[in-house]
Amino acid sequence: MPSTNASRKGQEKPREIVDAAEDYAKERYGISSMIQSQEKPDRVLVRVKDLTVQKADDVVWVRARVHTSRAKGKQCFLVLRQQQFNVQALVAVGDHASKQMVKFAANINKESIIDVEGVVRKVNQKIGSCTQQDVELHVQKIYVISLAEPRLPLQLDDAIRPEVEGEEDGRATVNQDTRLDNRVIDLRTSTSQAIFRLQSGICHLFRETLINKGFVEIQTPKIISAASEGGANVFTVSYFKNNAYLAQSPQLYKQMCICADFEKVFCIGPVFRAEDSNTHRHLTEFVGLDIEMAFNYHYHEVVEEIADTLVQIFKGLQERFQTEIQTVSKQFPCEPFKFLEPTLRLEYCEALAMLREAGVEMDDEEDLSTPNEKLLGRLVKEKYDTDFYVLDKYPLAVRPFYTMPDPRNPKQSNSYDMFMRGEEILSGAQRIHDPQLLTERALHHGIDLEKIKAYIDSFRFGAPPHAGGGIGLERVTMLFLGLHNVRQTSMFPRDPKRLTP
């Protein structure tokens, strides 16, 4: 007589056979073999953002990440995410899905990439948790393309939760270091996707606007033989048997291009600053949007051109990127960015008067501190209702050696900064284009003339009057969106304490 265990084993085998036989959907789900470009099937993958009521009752294929999953009886709800868009998907026991298929779907790890075939169905009640609120996907086939590990270093729902909301109800939020240590996952959040799509828009609008204005895009060297501005805040690199430096600015080369008769130039590229500044707005590497332009009679021709370029960028962002702006504001609420046309321009002495009236003690030739910049921004907003303005005629003593002195007041200079929400985003000036005056100013600043010989020599053969400035891309993004740390708007930030990832 067989043992009880043997009897049980004998009973289990036919049950397994029955279960396998009942899994009529076994060909409709599973883990796909690795895609190694073995074939190119004639299959169109529909974008999640295009799943609307216009596609109701269509059978579509979608590739997306599993954002969340929730099993309930004989059905499983998935939220499928593709960049900043998501849609609800339903796997339910029926003609196309077996209970084994539902179980398989429910157990797919979050962040896995899957291919799904399903029917787009209009829903009676809006799905508030998804961007595609009017439809859901009724799944007929589901295949895992890339399986994520079960333990994630951070949860995306926590990463997009407003900090205030987390503090109020005790739910988790994700701190900055955790985000940056796991940047690839953090960049998947809808907020990060929106930030960097808008930042891409800034570059596009900058380039588009300037090309329409007759500017020429140039590329300048980042490995140079001497510190860009004769200063010490440079990174030194080994260059064969000599030392070289990473460029602090493309300015000297922009000016050389003006001397070479290009008249109007701009460039977009990395800028390196070896400054041990651990603040909310400083990076050791950032993207510079740089402009240089010859003018006819007055450097204000250039100031107006740069200010108008920034205004065109602001208008373009508000017209073309409302979805991204609203996505970011859900997590980081902020007042809409305001600006005037034409741009408000104040002289430095006017700013000093406003600050002194507010109780700040400052000398006439003293530079603005960060707190005073922010205070001035609030005062300007109260008085003029603008977040963007130009501050003109800085004291000569606080500007670099190549800055043109004001001919009427030797203590002032033909220089300017531009501000967004009380923080500087551009520093610029009319450059000295006379080699003799340039030499005098360099010596006044204690700069070794031999190290800037090539720069000074470029003005010896006729140089037009010109001016320009450099804009920090990450700062513009941060301040336009009302964010509080430039690391949020740098894809892989570099600061004195971070060199990875």
Curated annotation (Swiss-Prot):
Its main location: cytoplasm. GO terms for cellular component: aminoacyl-tRNA synthetase multienzyme complex; cytoplasm; cytosol; synapse. Coiled coil: none annotated. Pfam families: tRNA-synt_2 (PF00152), tRNA_anti-codon (PF01336). It is found in: Cytoplasm. Residues 251-254 are annotated as: Aspartate. The keyword Acetylation applies. Its EC number is 6.1.1.12. L-aspartate binds at residues 229, 273, 427, 431. This is Aspartate--tRNA ligase, cytoplasmic.
